[in-house]
Amino acid sequence: MSDWLIETETLAALLEADPSADRVVLDCSWYLPEAGKAAIDDFHAGHIPGARFIDLTEVSDPDSPFVNMLPTAAHFASVVGGLGVGAETEVIIYDAGYVSARLWWMFRAFGHARIKILNGGWRKWRTELRTVETGYPMPATARNFPARPVGQGVARLHDVRQIVDHGGAAIIDARTAARFDGHEGSGYPGVTSGYMPGAINTPWARFFEPAPSYRFVSPARAAQVFAEYGVDLTGPIVTTCGSGVTAAILGFMLEAIGHTDWRLYDGSWHEWGQHPDTAKLKKPA
């Protein structure tokens, strides 16, 4: 797990000691449409010195009817290369909530291994009163980013329908209990709420320490959380959520405990909930 995380004090020291290193810090903060605000405005109000903003919408598939879907390798390479990320660049990602694991998963899916998440993210950085910048960052020099085609770590609609109908893997859903149960809106206009038959609700927030830490829980604690929700860690797992964002948190924690047999359902509920032929359940109020 330490291979994919960097602590705030470590990053602060690196930025001061070696500011010219082949390193790019990316703020990937993002809001659900129902929030009615844009994360880029928060970035302009304050960000880690030298950081650049990566827009989750911009780095997703522009032609998909579903939000936050993986783009082509060429599209991903164009966006991140334009932010100054090259083949050997160390990428450090952070946000103000729950998005960093999605970018961690995307970079890995496209073949980039030099990727770390700032443990505790922007909230911990600010709580510790570390240096911040405001406004726009300096323009980045575009680099060539050699993205490879996505491999086996992605589950598609037909894969998940097969699992729902015939088994073969556990499906774990990272959304809040209220969204999963269908007692709260999906978060996306026009998309019904509820859950897939057989899915296990495993809320993403259980994998973070409370304020003022905001850090990921330890692998030992993560294993306990999975056990509390009855997740079978002996077989394959598919992670899902509203639109493939917090599902990556579950995947990150599965990797942390050594469970590598997992895939992320990229369309997640935004796709499943809109499909006319998928089974959708709700729990009684």
Regions found by a protein language model. Give the residues of each.
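Cytosolic catalytic domains that perform sulfur/thiol-centered chemistry
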Residues: 1-285
